[in-house]
């Protein structure tokens, strides 16, 4: 504010503060008006600094004047303020704003006359304002001055903020003052993203251009020399004219103002767009009943600006419609002001009118004039009742005891007795806030199971007993309730009709009220006065004793109170006589809320016809279920339906009801499966006493969510449609509905929780309705606990039938047979069949799988092969010889029953694995030899090319996972593989697999590696450069090799692929070489297969290669990038490419060019992604005009630890971009932030830490990075913050160079994006994933992932592994900035790494080393030595 106050100084400020805002008004100008004016100018993209001089004020006035006619009130106020300020600067004496405007008008008229005079004298020396696009140079020639970015930015901002509201038109008019058609088109292009609006504008311009051409026909004949041609419509729109022509027309004699004409056309188009975006007519703008007048005026003028009418019409609208459409409150006031009132007077008069506050004031005024009017809120019960306030203390009316001025009366104000106060009075009253219970004489009754299960799961309702006038209070308090009581549900208020004194009345059954209170009714007999306390205070009543009342055909006699009660109440004094009880039947389990999937409705599927016997069976079943409250009848108002049918139970004449809930299941929300698998007996601890229970009708014991029940509706049809079908819906969890298992499990867990907490010594395994209960208690104690558990379940409505209560072993549980000290699967009988169908085989495989968990050695691979492919279930499948053999072996294994033992937590687990051949493995898990806890098999082949070691590692992982699930720990393994073999393979593949502790066991057949690849080239052996190529269209290919000794060979192949030809070339080299050979390939595919050392494969060609490899003594295989200019590789490339390869990379050129136009990828990325020769890729980059700005990056010594990021703010287009760089990889995260504050930086750091492992950040000393918010964020996320040191090369080098790089990429893609924030994210994507180079030839995105993954692996696996030579280290010496390497990694510590470079062992600080996996690029030549961090 201080800055703006300096616009005026000293005496001028005093003059400013004497000027009045309005003639005769009280308010005067203040400093705040200057501050406001400068902010408004800033908003309209005008320089606020112009306010400091008279000349500047004049320039502002010239700019604002054209917008006054159509502008907002703010523009007019701004114009008035600047006009007044101009007068103060010029020392022109004025008293108020009006005088200032008159003076300005006078000056402008004088200037106009002078200008006209000067024009006639041809002495026009006046300076044109710099804001106009056409200015005169020193020679007096008109020159175009392009629109400033500030003006364009202001225009874009207007459209972004206002969309196409009416304000846009005056803003456009002001910003485009004097512009040429080219400038106007520039303005339209900046908002080209609004395509619909631009299309409408284009149509209007085309129409106007056509109209111009019609009215101004072109003159016949050529244009005379020196004469300017006449503009056509398309010339005015700037499409067929150039800038010089436009300037010529605008400054010619006579001038043709093409800019103004085009501007007029655009404004016509903008008017149409505004009408579309603001479709409300001025006639529809009416003030709401509670809408403040100010808001109504805002809406009115906004709509008025959008109206396409002349200013006179708009003035008429303001005068008439504004008052006419106001609400009645405001209209009254506005009419009173008269017709000549200004808008300001109207707004002042209507301030505060029309809102709730105004209504309250009017009401208060009205209320103050009404004396003693009672407003009663209740029904008609209080018709003649006038409540007079009376003091308890002095007895006078008009005040209450709390406000009484008389001396305090002794004793109780209610009963008059001394010794207590009224609040402690024990005199009888209807005490709504009582603490005594309803039935003190007996405890809450417990239900018998039968009764519990007979009631509806939803009802929580009072029941009135017929018969005895008093409740039974037998010794056990167990009395059975007959089912013919009236039931009153509590979904609505329990209102009943009662007969009292020969009259019928409606009354509320209130178990919370002590007394029965009725409203005015005439009763015979004597009464005595009484006062009772209620919710609304104290009321006076008449007490009648021994009054007979009849409710629901039952009679009771008791005390009744008559008085002004809001509702008739039957209290407990009557209810207890009637034998009314509150019942809580079935399980009081909370229902789990369930919904349909969003946007879906319930099922509406018609019932299909059923046979007579099925209809009878279903009718009977549903009648029983209805009686038990499990289903309820519903009417035709429920539109949903699910089909129902019936099937006969196994080995029984009884029927089972089945509802086809498939459609409802599709529409029901998804549930999280509470239990992810079934418990396994091998995980059970050995227990002294065991019981197995089963919950009867498990699902039917749990209520279904009330609002969901309607969707379970079904219909029992009648025979021959004799009558409408009977409609039901479920009240409990239905069988076959997808939510039932999860909700049941969840409810059961909640119910068992208190029992488990009370009895920690008891183990309960719960799976659906099967319960295994084990303990180390004596059998009698154990059985007492079981009884307690069953009672606990019964209390919640879960019935455990005796029929399924297993007390003695063997226990049948979950398909297992449990004995006290061992377990097995329930007996398995394999069928004997002549013909096997697909379905039979599926069942057989299922049984064998089930048996394999305890019977070792079971195989099913050959049986599974029989049912591969799409076959019908009933198709007959002939058994192959192998399958018959496998089945016979399995039958033999199953002849002898095998048992498993139980788990002893004190002993360790051991897992032993055997290889069965044909990719099948078997294993046993035990704690004592020959006493298996469980067994299993493994027969998966996860990849096409594999070897036994790889498969063994997969077996071990499967067992480890299984053990963690069952026992919560991993076993110690005994594996049939020698330590040396394992170590050899593990050295190469330790990254891919984790193996727990293990030992060698000599169980043939042993696992071994059949051949081994060398790590270094074999000295003296011939080197074969191999390559293959294939044409995609003709499928013709070539494979061949060239050796370092000059040998070469090429063969032609048909019906092949690139990958096959590469493998074929390796096979040729192996065939034609000696017992030792070096092979160099450019195929990552071939390298990947062979480096994994497979000993079997689904590919015949790979099997042939394996056979050749086994014959060799030594083989070295290496990879080089394709077409790298490496001698032999380039030769063989030419050899196999003749007539083949040409096609391959040519079809990549177009795609690469297309990608480069989008992402400006560097040549390495294109060569790699599109298989292009470097020459072609470099040519694409060279021909791109945006990629020729590259400079060299400077390199200091930077900390390259994996967790270090550098942060910095950079500026572009007047906006702030916060950039974070991962130092080790060059990966970037960047974002446009609203302001350079600590809050924004802290939020960015937290977001960064949420996505990547950030250990330390390095920033400059800017106030945003040194702020408390950033420190707090770093403290919370455990990030170390370091600050840059000025003049230190290690300071902020990486992020500074990345800022430059990012800005360069933004420049390349800027025109593809409308907003800077979009361009920034596009540039980040391009830098991270579309630019390759530097270490490993990766992109920054690939490099960061590799570095982080490598860091994790080296940290975690170092504990178990010592041979980590497979990683390569690139490092820098203290003085030399060039990266050296690759060196071997010997050890990785916290602060340093030990490496071996050639024969020298060095210790390098961790921050000066980068560790990455070696992918066999040792022979790639100089090109593979790590370059700089960015691209070459």
From Swiss-Prot:
Annotated region described as Interaction with Gp41, given as residue ranges: 7-31
Bias (Basic and acidic residues): 460-469
Ranges for region Dimerization/Multimerization of capsid protein p24: 277-363
Residue positions binding Zn(2+): 1156, 1160, 1184, 1187
Cleavage (site feature) positions: 132-133, 363-364, 376-377, 431-432, 439-440, 485-486, 584-585, 1024-1025, 1144-1145
Zinc finger feature spans (CCHC-type): 389-406, 410-427
Region Interaction with host AP3D1: start-end pairs: 12-19
Cofactor detail note: Binds 2 magnesium ions for reverse transcriptase polymerase activity. Binds 2 magnesium ions for ribonuclease H (RNase H) activity. Substrate-binding is a precondition for magnesium binding.
Region described as Interaction with membrane phosphatidylinositol 4,5-bisphosphate and RNA: 14-33
Annotated motif Tryptophan repeat motif, positions: 982-998
PROSITE patterns per the UniProt record, alphabetical: ASP_PROT_RETROV (PS50175), ASP_PROTEASE (PS00141), INTEGRASE (PS50994), INTEGRASE_DBD (PS51027), RNASE_H_1 (PS50879), RT_POL (PS50878), ZF_CCHC (PS50158), ZF_INTEGRASE (PS50876)
Motif interval(s): Nuclear export signal: 16-22
DNA-binding region: 1367-1414
EC number: 3.4.23.16, 2.7.7.49, 2.7.7.7, 3.1.26.13
Active site residues of this protein: 510
Integrase-type zinc finger segments: 1147-1188
The Peptidase A2 domain, residue ranges: 505-574
Annotated stretches, region: Dimerization of protease: 486-490, 534-540, 573-585
Residue numbers marked as site, Essential for RT p66/p51 heterodimerization: 985, 998
Site description Cis/trans isomerization of proline peptide bond, residues in chain: 221-222
Region named Disordered: 443-482
Boundaries of every Integrase catalytic domain copy: 1198-1348
Catalysed reaction equations from the record: Specific for a P1 residue that is hydrophobic, and P1' variable, but often Pro; Endohydrolysis of RNA in RNA/DNA hybrids. Three different cleavage modes: 1. sequence-specific internal cleavage of RNA. Human immunodeficiency virus type 1 and Moloney murine leukemia virus enzymes prefer to cleave the RNA strand one nucleotide away from the RNA-DNA junction. 2. RNA 5'-end directed cleavage 13-19 nucleotides from the RNA end. 3. DNA 3'-end directed cleavage 15-20 nucleotides away from the primer terminus; 3'-end directed exonucleolytic cleavage of viral RNA-DNA hybrid; DNA(n) + a 2'-deoxyribonucleoside 5'-triphosphate = DNA(n+1) + diphosphate
UniProt-listed PANTHER family: ENDOGENOUS RETROVIRUS GROUP K MEMBER POL PROTEIN, RNA-DIRECTED DNA POLYMERASE-RELATED
Note: HIV-1 lineages are divided in three main groups, M (for Major), O (for Outlier), and N (for New, or Non-M, Non-O). The vast majority of strains found worldwide belong to the group M. Group O seems to be endemic to and largely confined to Cameroon and neighboring countries in West Central Africa, where these viruses represent a small minority of HIV-1 strains. The group N is represented by a limited number of isolates from Cameroonian persons. The group M is further subdivided in 9 clades or subtypes (A to D, F to H, J and K).
Protein name: Gag-Pol polyprotein
Gene: gag-pol
